[in-house]
Amino acid sequence: DGTSSETISSVEGARYTLDFEALEREAADPKCKLFILCNPMNPVGSVLTKAELDRIAEICNANNVKLCSDEIHCDLILEEGKQHIPAGRESNLAENSVTLMAASKTFNIAGLGTSFAIIPNRQLRQAFTNAAAGIVPWVTVLGLAATKAAFTQCDEWHQQQLTYLRENRDMVFNTVNNIDGLKMLKADATFLAWVDASGLGVENVQQWAEEKGVGPSPGIDFHKADHFRINFGCSKAMLQDILQRLAS
């Protein structure tokens, strides 16, 4: 259909953030019509600040680029003091954005196939509905009921889950940074750890991990062949086994 995409890389410093110079350059291209954002960011786990969202809004609005913000991990903020700001809540983004959310990541109900889009602008909402017709399935009754229950009746469970995941994240962070050749930054959010394995000096870091009996998500899927992603949304016993294998 003639469409194409360009990837905006994340920039590593004290934390990961977007390469705003690259975003500004790509948005200035008249062919650019849509910026797809992931916030919290997957796989690096950063939560964008209001200043960063304001910069995104400035770039998108100046170039008439729509924003589609995937915020499926927004209820998995692990770092104390960090706050998720929905793109559609920002006045300078509301009329130019589509915000995608679901209970599936936080409450483990992905199999029910239920998500939702928040689109304040009526014209944009109608265009989204028209484009989705015949492609995107309607939600099921069970999925709708489960989503409502998750967001209205599970606060105590959710808080316990965040505590558990925070402990798992810290375990991964402390262990990985003590394994020769591996390093990582502490994720603000999600149940995913982005591991820099460039220090191993091996040709294939995925093979290195698999030979130790660990099957992480390949970094090449995220344009970083010398990295891999670990899911720490599991039992502590399983996570300890994973980390022991990597350290062996």
Regions found by a protein language model. Name each.
Residues 148, 164-173, 183-196, 223-226:
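Conserved glycine-rich beta-strand-loop-beta hairpin in the small C-terminal domain of fold type I
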Residues 25, 207-217, 222-248:
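PLP-dependent enzyme catalytic core of the Aspartate aminotransferase-like
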Residues 1-5:
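Substrate-binding/gating loop at the entrance of the active-site cleft, primarily
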